[in-house]
Amino acid sequence: MTKLILTTMELCGNKCHACAIEEEGQIMELRLEAAARQSILGNIYVGQVENIASNIQAAFVLIAPGVRGYFPLQEAEQVIYASGKAPGSPLRPGDQILVQVSRDAMKGKLPALTANLNFTGKYLVLTTGEKKFGLSGKLSGSERHTLSGWLEAEAARPDKEYGLIVRTNAAQAEKAEILQELSYLKSLYEKVAVNGKSRTCFSLLYETEPVYLTTLRDIYSENLTDIVTDDPEIFQQITSYLKETSPEEESKARFYQDKLLPLYKLSRMENALDEVQKEKIWLNSGG
């Protein structure tokens, strides 16, 4: 039995989202993320080319007023224009393009941007830059054969404007689950990459999912028996997510309510954190 526990707790004076994966009453994995997220990694924007630096083969693209990112010119042919220009046209200052943040700003470096938009699901990844069909190298020969057969019609479509990568997780899924997720990712692509062409400059077209949704996405549904949270906002988001992506899983979500015993205390998350902090690794040198 695998239970997913999603809650909010204080850590070092900061409010955090905490996700615990519990098996047979024991926390096996704990993921934390600041509730006030600073990262923009994975976000997709309508950016505007500020200038082009041919000497370093890069363009500097504004994704918000005063916020610029580094865009490699070798991806210029993959650009989806929001300014009405035809695909494959030369990139010019002032052009409005769809970009995804591939690396956060760090140590004085600008955030890195890419034209290859990625939409990641539990079993599949849909991409706009590489319009090929691929499978994870970790899949066995028989798994690759089965999954290729299930997605043969989609892979053979000559008119598709995106690529598809089959993740290792897909080996655990039924055909209906794979096709249901494909439908969801295609609708997300349509909403962001197609409809985004008509959005105004600096629009945020897609925001990376918080840790509690990515954790939920990555857990195999066949092993997951219970999803519990005591945070109303998290509960609303996970039920909406399940309704859209896996309606058959929605009944597993439940809301815990006890003001005297918060969920993080009931599930002993503080103890799990203490255990992690106490762990020591003994080196050969004795340090």
Positions of predicted regions on the chain:
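DE-rich acidic low-complexity regions and acidic surface loops
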Residues: M1-G287
